[in-house]
């Protein structure tokens, strides 16, 4: 039954060697993001909720960029297996152009109409007032972040995930130090509060971009070919749109859907407490899921390269099944660790530091239990969508599997329970488990079918 787990010697070592730098990168980013939330939370739960609301449109930008990054990786990982560096440059050029244009448009909208953007998320005018200066500044930081993220994604796709780990580590360290200095007014700087958090984010993105651009100029593995970067050609643009558009649509729809969860919460009773609980529980969960996305991204590189070098469909299916089961078991252990850490460390010692109300703390606990309970399914579904299906070029199926449960099941149920029936908030929190419960059986059928294996570098 599990014969597919018998892979060639060194397969699992290669998987975890690729995943480890990505996991470390995710842990650094998430841990320092948790510290970021913690430092803003020290100003008060109202300030923390305002920043969470302000980050909803930022989250959409991040998801669009991640979609472009992932869509580029679908092509790059297979071109890497083929050894076609010129085509890799063409893909990067298209990704940089689109990412830079989209992030600039968002930044301008948030700079000139910040309050209008925030009013789309919440009707709490106090949160809008606090979040307006934050969103006006932080929007520009994601122009630089979008460009560096596309390049870092390329390096990950050519089996160099360590680069992203180092760049994001330096960036997030800069962000944490900047937060401490600018939020609380240390080292002679004025205490800027929420505005200081935005300024620190902008500074960290400048550092991130400078490191990525400097490395790109010196990289010899895939050296920059300016003619290919600036003139990628119509054929490559057609292929990029064909394979990347569904991934971009996937991440955009998923990002908008997840942002609507915050919007729904923002229009419920006790919205401030509910959003604060969601922010803290989500930060805790992201620490655990850092490992899941490390496995998923490593799987995308391995699957894509395997198909790119011309391996058989059967070989691709065996690898897909092996990495999905590995992710499921790994996530099962992560869920146990999350619960143990919450009971022994976070709940008694860390949560009180956030100054949450009793109701918010109770809702936070319910959310953490739900996140930990579905962690194994989260591991399987994320690796199946981000790693296996995308790595295999099956981008349309991954679009449907990733978004149908969220848009057609989870969000309607949340609207019904939270806005119509107005159930207790603790009961509403249980809805966050629905998405992964629904994805798993459909994903299993798709993986076993083998219809997801497509050699997109030879499909001209």
Regions found by a protein language model. Give the residues of each.
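Small-residue-rich hydrophobic transmembrane alpha-helices
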Residues: 48-108, 145-164, 275-341, 346, ...
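Hydrophobic/aromatic residues within transmembrane alpha-helices of membrane transport systems
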Residues: 24, 36-40, 51, 76, ...
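Short runs within selected transmembrane alpha-helices of multi-pass transporters and secretion channels
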Residues: 69, 73, 138-156, 164-175, ...
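Helix-terminus/linker motif at the lipid-water interface of multi-pass membrane proteins
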Residues: 27, 31-49, 118-125, 181-192, ...
């Amino acid at each position: 039954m599990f014969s597919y787990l018998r892979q060639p010697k060194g397969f699992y070592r290669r998987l975890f060697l690729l995943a480890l730098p990505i996991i470390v990168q995710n842990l650094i980013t998430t841990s320092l993001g948790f510290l970021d939330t913690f430092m803003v939370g020290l100003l008060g739960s109202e300030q923390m909720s305002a920043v969470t609301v302000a980050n909803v449109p930022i989250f959409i930008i991040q998801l669009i960029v991640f979609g472009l990054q992932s869509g580029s990786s679908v092509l790059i990982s297979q071109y890497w297996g083929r050894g076609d560096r010129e085509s890799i440059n063409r893909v990067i050029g298209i990704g940089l152009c689109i990412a830079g244009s989209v992030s600039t448009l968002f930044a301008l909208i948030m700079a000139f109409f910040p309050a209008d953007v925030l009013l789309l998320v919440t009707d709490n005018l106090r949160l809008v007032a606090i979040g307006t200066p934050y969103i006006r500044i932080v929007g520009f930081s994601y122009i630089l972040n979008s460009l560096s993220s596309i390049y870092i994604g390329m390096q990950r796709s050519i089996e160099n995930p360590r680069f992203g780990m180092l760049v994001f580590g330096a960036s997030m360290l800069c962000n944490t130090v900047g937060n401490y200095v600018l939020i609380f007014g240390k080292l002679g700087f004025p205490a800027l509060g929420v505005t200081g958090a935005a300024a620190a984010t902008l500074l960290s993105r400048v550092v991130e971009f400078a490191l990525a651009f400097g490395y790109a100029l010196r990289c010899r593995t895939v050296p920059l070919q300016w003619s290919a970067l600036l003139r990628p050609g119509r054929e490559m643009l057609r292929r990029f749109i064909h394979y990347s558009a569904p991934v971009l649509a996937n991440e955009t729809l998923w990002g908008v859907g997840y942002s609507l969860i915050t919007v729904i919460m923002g229009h419920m009773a006790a919205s401030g407490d509910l959003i604060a609980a969601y922010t803290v529980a989500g930060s805790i969960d992201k620490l655990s899921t850092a490992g899941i996305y490390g496995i998923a991204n490593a799987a995308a590189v391995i699957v894509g390269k395997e198909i790119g070098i011309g391996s058989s469909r059967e070989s691709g299916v065996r690898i897909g099944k092996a990495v999905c089961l590995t992710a499921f078991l790994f996530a099962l252990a992560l869920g146990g660790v999350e619960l143990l850490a919450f009971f022994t460390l976070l709940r008694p010692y860390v949560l009180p530091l956030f100054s949450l109300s009793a109701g918010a703390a109770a809702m936070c606990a319910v959310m953490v239990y739900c996140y930990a309970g579905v962690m194994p399914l989260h591991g399987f579904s994320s690796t199946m969508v981000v790693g296996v299906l995308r790595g295999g070029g099956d981008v349309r199926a991954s679009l449907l599997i990733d978004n149908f449960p969220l848009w057609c099941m989870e969000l309607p149920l949340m609207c019904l329970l939270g806005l119509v029936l107005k159930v207790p908030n603790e009961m509403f929190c249980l809805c966050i488990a629905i998405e992964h419960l629904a994805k798993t059986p459909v994903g299993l059928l798709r993986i076993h079918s083998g219809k997801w294996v497509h050699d997109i570098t030879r499909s001209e």
